[in-house]
Amino acid sequence: MEFPTRFDVIVIGGGHAGTEAALAAARMGSQTLLLTHNIETLGQMSCNPAIGGIGKSHLVKEIDALGGAMARATDQAGIQFRVLNSRKGPAVRATRAQADRILYKAAIRHMLENQPNLTLFQQAADDLIVENDQVVGVVTQTGIRFNAKTVVLTTGTFLGGVIHIGMQNHAGGRAGDAPANALAKRLRELPFNVGRLKTGTPPRIDARTVDFSAMQQQWGDDPTPVMSFIGSRDEHPEQICCYVTRTTEETHDIIRSGFDRSPMFAGNIEGVGPRYCPSIEDKVNRFADKDSHQIFVEPEGLTTNELYPNGISTSLPFDIQLKAVRSIPGFENAHILRPGYAIEYDYLNPQDLRHTLETKFIQGLYFAGQINGTTGYEEAGAQGLLAGINASLRARDQEEWYPRRDEAYLGVLVDDLITMGTQEPYRMFTSRAEYRLILREDNADLRLTETGRKLGLVDDERWQKFSEKCEGIAKERSRLESTRIHPNTEAGERANGYLKQPMTRDQSLAELLRRPEIVYDHIAEIGAERAEDPNVADQVEIEIKYEGYISRQADEIERLRKNENTALPLDLDYDVIGGLSNEIKQKLKDVRPETVAQASRIQGVTPAAVSQILVHLKKRDLLKKQSA
């Protein structure tokens, strides 16, 4: 049958990418359908019960700055919060939260069920309806046809999913869920480059069978950091302790004894796994000189005994898993509630996408999340948000939007994927961003919330809090610049108490704050006044202390923006451009870069080749500027 309502946007999949995509499109006013195989698993944390971390929290904050759900759900579900790299510079500081799976899923579902313009429907999608290279709808497993102007695919690990435990394997999208085989078959019929990747998860442990006294305690920060720019510590549930233990040489011997029955070593798994989250058998094999590996023992929630042993993801046979777990200090009598497993699944080459995450071959079709070769909730959520935004814009015939590399980690993520592709699950790190001093976790709202407001993503409550923060920053910055301290005053004596070289002339509080030995708390004592909002104080301190570095990065960005804004026609014939080697021509044809700057980032494309392209465009009057 044909469903009576025609939608602007259909989102397939209710994981972290799908929920952000659906919420974004609906917030912008598009009539949106979220199609999921099971409404009970909306927002489910399929692997580790945590949000954030190095590079990842930057994405969470950017999602939040654009009105997304992930940070708000984390504040409502976080049972331990920590700031990582707190002693390092502001560019690499990152917030990480341990989350209660049940509370997190409930928070996401509440947002979905109470979002205007959003309809939920439980059915697996089996087919895409494509007419004249344009997607026009979806057909479900029971033959229901949903018509729409745009479709966002966020299929996670479900496309052709195969679960491996030892030499046994079976079809599955994750433990307990069927794979999306019909949809996987349909995508292979379309002009996409399909590959295989794999990921894994550790066995879950019953906390009642664990000796925590044999482990090191790891408490969160107090006071707890807040994930959302509009969040509050009052939202945080009870805070709990995590634990740390380590594998032993006995553990490694047991693991090695199972190598002959490991699907990874036996060649049963063709997909490449995540480099930065390897299985324990991979770690033991690759780092044979190490006699132990760290394991973070993370409770999965306040109302469950289930523990997540972070660091021992595995697809070894269950008998080996059990022996290995029980050789670890504190786990001698451990009961495994769920065995660890590896899952292999289809992904599509992200070089087949545009920066908006729309496919190059089929108009109105967008991909987000693990289907694009990424790993991680945060990477998925950020892509989902961007895909939802652009699906909504296209459905209303409005100009597309995406952030540049100098505007957001989301811009770095997408540009990396579509420019270089990926042969392994892609994870975000701060080191991937060349402008990381500008793309800090703390200023994601200053970078993106105004854009989010223009796009219709940011509600009045968030906009008011953002406006108050901006006003507070301007006011405090002005106070620090205008308040002068004289050496021969009481305030001057207080200042000299912190300085290695005493003041010889009067200085503003801002000048003093630029001195390496002075921090904002000192300034508050010297000036006998401080900003009421600690977020304002942090922002002002960073802006003033790192002003020179930030200014230099801004100048570099301005120089490069000329090429970033020079568009390349997607149908440009590289074969007729003189001076390009066949290798460079092929790389350009494979990627089909959208801008001159993107072309310059393709491995092997030389500055001379970029110059030849510019000359060709100028001769044929094809030079165009874009505003994205």
Swiss-Prot record:
Residues annotated to bind FAD: 13-18
Single GO MF descriptor: flavin adenine dinucleotide binding
Source organism of the structure: Marinobacter nauticus (strain ATCC 700491 / DSM 11845 / VT8)
Protein name, per record: tRNA uridine 5-carboxymethylaminomethyl modification enzyme MnmG
Gene Ontology CC terms, in alphabetical order: cytosol
GO biological process, one term: tRNA methylation
SMART domains: GIDA_assoc_3 (SM01228)
Source organism phylogeny: Bacteria, Pseudomonadati, Pseudomonadota, Gammaproteobacteria, Pseudomonadales
Quaternary organization: Homodimer. Heterotetramer of two MnmE and two MnmG subunits.
Gene: mnmG
One Pfam family per UniProt: SAM_GIDA_C
Binding-site list for NAD(+): 273-287
